[in-house]
A protein has these predicted regions:
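Conserved small-residue motifs centered on glycine
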Residues: 364-489
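Structured mid-domain segments that build the active-site/substrate or prosthetic-cofactor binding neighborhood
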Residues: 293-348, 355-407
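Helix-loop-helix "hinge/cap" segment bordering the ligand-binding cleft or interdomain interface
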Residues: 147-223, 241-288, 297-300, 348-361, ...
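Secondary-structure transition/capping motifs at alpha-helix termini
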Residues: 1, 68-73, 97-98, 180, ...
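Extracytoplasmic/periplasmic substrate-binding proteins
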Residues: 49-62, 175-181, 215-273, 303-341
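Secondary-structure capping and boundary motifs in well-ordered enzyme cores
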Residues: 59, 256, 289, 341, ...
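General small-molecule cofactor/ligand-binding pocket signal
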Residues: 74-80, 275-276, 323-325
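Conserved N-terminal structural module of periplasmic/extracytoplasmic solute-binding proteins
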Residues: 3-12, 20-187, 227, 232, ...
Length: 527
């Protein structure tokens, strides 16, 4: 049964402000309609930028004309905000206004709400139209990730290389202060204090902090989010869920979560975390460490050590040295960088686009991006302009700013996330080449950094990314409650904490946990 459009818009509006009226989505396949227009089909695309530090896809990108000639598509591409939370806000606002783009990417939580409200096209029949992409990316796990009631409402594609982040520290600051790499939470507190109060950069000013972060959450890394996971891991409460058979449940219900809260409050009260951490966006956070604002943080391999990303830090601090370290060990001997999941991005086709007969055109475009000409153009740019081929036929970035690793060339591969499957040696070696820094003359390799990060201690949590999500009201209560404890608005005592957790469970937390248990058991996710 097809939902009334006004009802869908109302449901999406409620979703954007925090209340969702879940409904049965349309079961009509997106592939059942065909485009009747004789002229070019206008397709709007919202994409996550491959590199947020450089500009959007340029207007003179060669792909626009190629796509028009090959598929009769007039593509209008617009970048999404760099942070996942800001992306969610933009997408939900568009849904509330019944103005979703034809194709866009969404996190699973937002995707699920849009799908349940009938705002997304049923794409089940479109896999057959994309044989190459389906073989490369859409295994049964990927299809299951976007399945509702036996139908698929999106394409789950690899979003990033797995375990590509780590806890990092300014080794030059450690050396200047005569400190060792911290091994335990006690060690870390001492190092963070010294980084804040002992002038590690030697400029005679009190302008540094020990730890840096920003709020980056998703359905498997609940508030305070990814940048604090190495600290949560020291207490065994990394990730939203504990996925073990013996101790399954929401981490917030574990006694150790309170221990983490006490530790985090100690860091905050001692003034050793950048006080802007709750306000920073991703770009603010990355700009801050490049300016030497803090000396310990969790970061992604490419954002840390790829040539264009590392260059500002190298220029500011030629003698600076940021190294990957083991996650610190907590009082009970636990340690983890965070939960390791199968990183997936859901590409969606809006229901309206399908009604207008655009779905098959979009599928053809998506398939073109997965191999041959489209893959090379989206992933590496133009041969002889952004890349050349080596003796083995592998792409290499052209030297200088215009190569695909340079600040100009990177703008031409902003759709790389639509092409890459993040598994082949060619992708990894070409994406993360070795180089020599321009100012300090150091040898650098973000691929070596990746392997270093992958070798650290992670918590295997495959499947956590597909677990049920809470209602918007419950999620808001959860996040605001923790923020109030961190800020001091609510005093962090055992009694106050227990009262908060009890209220959380009464509001729906316990029901959410039981829903998660049933899902995990049914899908064999418990270990």
């Amino acid at each position: 049964m097809k939902l009334n459009r006004k009802a869908l818009v109302l449901a999406a509006a409620l979703a954007a402000v925090g209340s969702f009226a879940f409904a049965q989505g349309s079961s009509e396949s997106a592939g059942s309609k065909t485009t009747q227009a004789a002229g070019p089909v206008h397709v709007t695309l919202w994409y996550p930028a491959t590199q947020t530090e450089v500009g959007p896809l340029p207007n003179d990108w060669a792909g626009y004309q190629i796509i028009k000639d090959k598929f009769n598509i007039e593509l209008e591409a617009q970048t999404l905000p760099s942070g996942t939370q800001d992306q969610d806000v933009k997408i939900q606002a568009a849904a509330a206004a019944d103005d979703l783009p034809d194709m866009f990417t969404a996190g699973r939580e937002v995707w699920l709400r849009l799908a349940n409200n009938g705002m997304l096209a049923d794409v089940t029949d479109l896999y057959a139209r994309m044989p190459n992409r389906t073989q490369l990316m859409f295994d049964e796990g990927a299809k299951k990730y976007t399945s509702l009631n036996g139908h698929n409402y999106g394409f789950a594609t690899p979003a990033a290389v797995s375990r590509n982040e780590g806890l990092v520290i300014r080794k030059d600051w450690l050396d200047k202060l005569g400190l060792e790499v911290p091994k335990t939470t006690d060690d870390l507190l001492k190092v963070l204090h010294a980084f804040t109060y002992d002038d590690p950069d030697g400029n005679g000013k009190k302008d540094t902090y020990g730890y840096g972060a920003f709020v980056e959450t998703n359905n498997y890394e609940a508030y305070p989010g990814r940048r604090l996971e190495p600290l949560m891991g020291a207490f065994g409460v990394e990730g939203t869920w504990n996925m073990t058979k013996a101790n399954f449940g929401l981490q917030i219900n574990k006694p150790e979560f309170y221990d983490f809260m006490v530790f985090m409050k100690q860091i905050i009260d001692d003034g050793v975390i950048d006080p802007n951490w709750m306000a920073y966006k991703k770009d603010d956070f990355r700009g801050a460490w490049k300016q030497g604002k803090f000396g310990c943080f969790r970061e992604q391999n490419s954002a840390l050590h790829s040539e264009n990303n590392y260059a500002p830090f190298d220029a500011n601090f030629p003698n600076g040295d940021i190294i990957v370290i083991d996650p610190v060990t907590g009082p009970s001997g636990k340690a983890s960088v965070g939960p390791a999941v199968r990183n997936m991005r859901v590409w969606c086709i809006s229901a309206k686009a399908a009604e207008q007969g655009k779905a098959e055109k979009i599928a053809d475009l998506f398939e073109w991006m997965s191999y041959g000409e489209g893959y090379m153009l989206c992933g590496f740019g133009r041969e002889g302009v952004e890349y050349t081929l080596d003796a083995n036929g592998n792409p290499q970035s052209v030297p200088g700013d215009k190569g695909y690793n340079g600040p100009v060339g990177q703008t031409y591969i902003q759709l790389r996330n639509m092409a890459f499957n993040y598994t082949s040696d060619m992708e990894l070696s070409s994406r993360y080449p070795s180089y020599t820094t321009k100012v300090s003359g150091k040898h650098m390799s973000s691929l070596e950094t990746l392997h270093n990060m992958q070798g650290r201690k992670w918590t295997d949590a495959v499947g956590m990314e597909s677990m049920p999500v809470p209602s918007t009201d419950l999620k808001t209560f959860y996040e605001q409650g923790l923020a109030e404890f961190f800020s001091g608005k609510r005093e962090l005592t055992k009694d106050n904490w227990n009262a908060f957790v009890k209220q959380f469970n009464n509001m729906g937390g316990k029901a959410w946990e039981e829903e998660g248990r049933k899902y995990a058991e049914a899908n064999g996710l418990l270990k």
